[in-house]
Amino acid sequence: MINIVVLGSMNTDLVMRTKICPSGGETIHGEPDGFSTGNGGKGANQAVAVARLSNPADTKVSMLGCVGDDAFGVEMLSGLKKDGVNVDNVKKIENKSTGVAMIIVEETGENRILLSEGANGNVDTAFVKAMEQRISTCNLLIMQLEIPLEAVEIALQIAHKHGVDVLMNPAPAIPLSHDMISYCAYLVPNEHEAAILLNQADSPATLENVDAYASKLLSFGVRKAVIITLGSQGAYYKSANGESALVSACKVKAVDTTAAGDTFIGAFSNSIAHGQPLKDSLEFAAKCSAITVQRKGAASSIPSLLEVDGSFNLKKNT
């Protein structure tokens, strides 16, 4: 049995769809029936992605984090359980609201997100230290940066102490110390996050510079591989043993990119945790993300393994 643990955020998504975003001081109409709510947060989305894209007979997925004592928290726990995610170590915080993300999705599928952390702010160092036994026994720990940074740092140290591989998705993007990066087995930023990690925020990764960016991030001590996602251009990887390649994205019409990155992380994590080759795992992740972007919603857009297995007509960009 492969044990995958996700430590991270859980948010309720409040989504508004619109042809274009309003400018400052401007009021516009969104799409008719364009408002929806649903479970989200990078942590929860990635846990759901791992669960839906794995076989429950050989994979256990657990969520670590906090929700508020409100209706959003109840719905979050119910949704995670329904997807087969273990929530025994999700803590309900009294007199706190569950995290909220306000998401504006344009006609092109591009999105803008505003976060209110709520109970996610209670995922502190004390919480993480109390989870040491759970972290120490997993095969892979997945983390993002929607919880307090000091909690992420402690979790990295615990995982390192027990020889547990960590996949870090450094989003939302903030600078990280070289020590923190060196505790990661897999570092998976997008083009903007990679630039911020390298203190080059004005120069996002492109096809022309992505190899140099990946090499520099590897030099900080990433143990196995750096994967830089490039949106519709795919993902570039470079491993510690020198292997590198661009894995093309699948050619589809995007409707909503909100959960594309989280689907990619979940799919890749499940595949690599089960011992699949790096490139094969990334190709699987690209296929899963291509299905996600053709649907509206966050967690609701993440496909199941059965759906992915049945989608053989996706073409790669050339």
From Swiss-Prot:
PROSITE patterns linked to this entry: PFKB_KINASES_2 (PS00584)
GO CC terms: cytosol; nucleus
Enzyme Commission number(s): 2.7.1.15
Subcellular location: Cytoplasm; Nucleus
UniProt GO MF annotations: ATP binding; metal ion binding; ribokinase activity
Residues reported to bind ATP: N190, T229, L230, G231, S232, Q233, G234, G261, D262
Binding site for K(+): D256, T258, T292, R295, G297, S301
Entry keyword annotation includes Transmembrane helix: no
Enzyme class: transferase
Catalysis: reaction(s): D-ribose + ATP = D-ribose 5-phosphate + ADP + H(+)
UniProt cross-references to Gene3D superfamilies, sorted A to Z: 3.40.1190.20
Nucleotide-binding as UniProt keyword: yes
The entry's keywords: ATP-binding, Carbohydrate metabolism, Cytoplasm, Kinase, Magnesium, Metal-binding, Nucleotide-binding, Nucleus, Potassium, Transferase
Cited function: Catalyzes the phosphorylation of ribose at O-5 in a reaction requiring ATP and magnesium. The resulting D-ribose-5-phosphate can then be used either for sythesis of nucleotides, histidine, and tryptophan, or as a component of the pentose phosphate pathway.
Quaternary data: Homodimer.
Xref: PANTHER family: RIBOKINASE, SUGAR KINASE
Protein name (record): Ribokinase
Gene name of the record: rbk1
